[in-house]
Structure formats: C-alpha cells, structure tokens
C-alpha cells in the first residue's frame, strides 16, 4: 500500500492567500524591480519540520565567481529547455541538492528582482515540500553544504539585524548557525516572512558588519544566483 499524501498544514494558509494579492507581492521587490534582464529563478522550499515550517538554503562554494561562501536559496539561470521559471527553480534545486522535485508543490511566484552584480532578473518560486526527500551537495564546485533552518530560528529576534554595505546599501539580515544571510536572499526571506505572517518584532536599529569575505563582488546585491 502507498502511504497517504500529507495534508497541507494550516500554517501555509496565510502565505497561500497572500500569493494571490499582486500588490503585496510587488511590495516585496519594490526596491529592486526587474528590468527585463536575463531570467533566473530561486526556490524557496518550505517544509514541515519538528518545530513547524522550515526552509532550505544552500551555502555556496568558496570558489564561486560571485556570492562565494554565502547562504542563498538554490537556483540559477533559466535554460531554453525549461517550461517556465518554476521549472527553472525546481531543476536547479534538484541539480544542487538532489531533492526529488516530484514531492514539491509550487505555491506561487514573486515578481522578478534585479541583481546588478550578476545581471539577472531573479524570480523567487515558493513551494511546499509535500514529500521530503534526502538532500546533499551534488557538486562541491557549486555548494559547500545544504541547510534546512526552522522558521522559529529565522524569526528569533536575537538572530535579526540590518547590514550596511560600504556602498551605502542597507537591508535586512539573519545571523544563523554562524553565517550571515543578507542581500537578495535576506530581502526575499524577509518579504516571505511578512507574507506568511511569521514575522516577530525585532530591533531594526541593530546593525551588524558584513564579513570581509562576503565583500568580494563589485555590487551590493549578494545572495542571489550566479550564471551556471
């Protein structure tokens, strides 16, 4: 006998409803709207863990041309063979982490956000990890580790801060497991937490430095996909 399909948890309801409100989606990328550049996509994969919702991240390999060593959502540039940007995000996630895409349900997409350092319009694809599968680094040239982080950890006020780039860029950040999530990844994550109703109050006056090892790109748009 096959096991029954898991029911979608109630904590996804608010996010699912928000994904039908275009004005709210536009707000997430209002500070960096798409410009018609080369398309790319990232997968914001939400699973049901022991402590409630959790999200998958990839630590990018130290040798990557851009965003080296940083925490990002799995993703990359669109291929001509992709049916759409959701297909791009699922394909890239499978290539990077080995996740079984047949156990993933796409919930919706955000409008594209422009990443100047890589020249991509990046579309975030939100998905429910209906049937979790094993994940691991598939190519050490692209990723150093796969991290699945509970939303309770991401929203802990002790882990929230803002960063200020030498260029003047300021934005949200998350301090998790010894890493700093910032740039586009933190921007999208912060927006998704708002859409889902998962945010908790935090000290927005707290500013933390960006590690020097993260300041190797020309522009302050770190945390997004590179051209694979």
Outline where the language-model segments fall:
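N-terminal leader/linker segments that precede catalytic domains of diphosphate-processing enzymes
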Residues: 1-72, 77-95, 99-133, 164, ...
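NUDIX/MutT-family hydrolases
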Residues: 138-175
């Amino acid at each position: 006998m096959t096991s029954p399909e898991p029911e979608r948890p109630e904590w996804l309801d608010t996010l699912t409803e928000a994904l039908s409100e275009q004005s709210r989606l536009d707000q997430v990328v209002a500070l960096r709207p798409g410009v018609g550049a080369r398309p790319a996509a990232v997968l914001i994969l939400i699973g049901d863990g022991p402590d409630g919702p959790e999200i998958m991240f990839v630590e990018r390999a130290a040798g990557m041309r851009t965003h080296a060593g940083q925490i990002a959502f799995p993703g990359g540039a669109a291929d001509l063979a992709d049916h759409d940007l959701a297909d791009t995000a699922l394909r890239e996630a499978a290539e990077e982490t080995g996740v079984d895409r047949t156990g993933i349900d796409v919930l919706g997409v955000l409008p594209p956000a422009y990443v100047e350092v890589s020249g991509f319009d990046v579309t975030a694809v939100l998905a429910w990890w209906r049937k979790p599968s094993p994940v691991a680094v598939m190519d050490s040239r692209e990723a150093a580790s796969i991290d699945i982080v509970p939303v309770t950890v991401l929203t802990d006020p002790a882990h929230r801060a803002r960063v200020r780039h030498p260029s003047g860029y300021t934005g949200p950040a998350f301090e998790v497991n010894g890493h700093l999530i910032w740039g586009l990844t933190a921007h999208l994550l912060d927006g998704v937490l708002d859409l889902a109703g998962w945010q908790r109050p935090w000290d927005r006056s707290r500013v933390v430095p960006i590690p020097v090892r993260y300041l190797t790109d020309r522009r302050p748009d770190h945390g997004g996909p590179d051209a694979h």
